């Protein structure tokens, strides 16, 4: 079993569904001088040219997934594994340990009172073992769908299918230590983040 790193910082796991506002919340924490690591970015980093994982992917799926300039064709890979549970399982078994190790290393180097791990799949993966508290950016599904359609120019059907692949709203709420209901404007979201920032500073001072 993965062990929680012996970090000095309180680690807040930040998660939420598509178009929930988790990226905006993470950006506000960064504005408040709180370091944030994005699990999605780490997932991209581990398959950059020169990374061993990229070579393993090419050997397993074929070199057609590698573009002429040596970069992984992410869209083609997603399409390949989307409807193939076995191939998806193989890919996750390769990438998840690499992603989690990089996150652990980053968390171990944090020196601030607290830091943020932002991950859309925090509750679906073992990344939840790396955090001390879970903050869910919550949003009603109707608002979520409208935002995702406007932001990404996707159809309602596609947005609903994406939502269906993620853990449900109630599941997230049940596993949250803290919840921000993000059904208003950005000013409201930022205000709620600022309040939690003060709370987390207090927690870090008294509990760590």
UniProtKB/Swiss-Prot annotation:
Gene Ontology annotations for the cellular component aspect, listed alphabetically: cytoplasm
GO biological process, one term: coenzyme A biosynthetic process
Pathway: Cofactor biosynthesis; coenzyme A biosynthesis; CoA from (R)-pantothenate: step 5/5
Keyword rRNA-binding: no
Record-listed E.C. numbers: 2.7.1.24
Annotated localization: Cytoplasm
Keywords: ATP-binding, Coenzyme A biosynthesis, Cytoplasm, Kinase, Nucleotide-binding, Transferase
GO terms for MF: ATP binding; dephospho-CoA kinase activity
Cited PROSITE patterns: DPCK
Main location: cytoplasm
Reactions accelerated catalytically: 3'-dephospho-CoA + ATP = ADP + CoA + H(+)
The organism's place on the tree of life at top rank: Bacteria
Cross-referenced PANTHER family: BIFUNCTIONAL COENZYME A SYNTHASE-RELATED (PTHR10695:SF46), DEPHOSPHO-COA KINASE-RELATED (PTHR10695)
Family: Belongs to the CoaE family.
Job description of the protein: Catalyzes the phosphorylation of the 3'-hydroxyl group of dephosphocoenzyme A to form coenzyme A.
Protein name from the UniProt record: Dephospho-CoA kinase
Organism: Hahella chejuensis (strain KCTC 2396)
């Amino acid at each position: 079993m993965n062990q929680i790193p012996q970090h000095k910082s309180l680690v807040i796991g930040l998660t939420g569904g598509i178009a929930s506002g988790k990226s905006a919340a993470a950006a506000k924490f960064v504005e408040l001088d709180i370091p944030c690591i994005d699990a999605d970015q780490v997932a991209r980093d581990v398959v950059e040219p020169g990374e061993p994982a990229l070579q393993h992917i090419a050997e397993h799926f074929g070199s057609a997934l590698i573009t002429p300039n040596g970069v992984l064709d992410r869209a083609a890979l997603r399409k390949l594994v989307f409807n193939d549970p076995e191939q998806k399982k193989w890919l996750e078994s390769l990438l998840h340990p690499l992603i989690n190790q990089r996150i652990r290393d980053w968390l171990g180097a944090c020196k601030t009172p607290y830091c943020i791990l932002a991950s859309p799949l925090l509750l679906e993966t073992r990344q939840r073992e790396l955090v001390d508290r879970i903050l869910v950016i919550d949003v009603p599904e109707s608002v979520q769908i409208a935002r995702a359609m406007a932001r990404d120019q996707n159809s309602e059907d596609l947005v609903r299918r994406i939502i269906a692949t993620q853990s449900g709203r109630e599941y997230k709420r049940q596993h949250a230590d803290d919840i921000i209901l993000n059904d208003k404007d950005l000013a409201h979201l930022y205000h709620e983040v600022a309040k939690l920032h003060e709370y987390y500073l207090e927690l870090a001072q008294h509990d760590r």
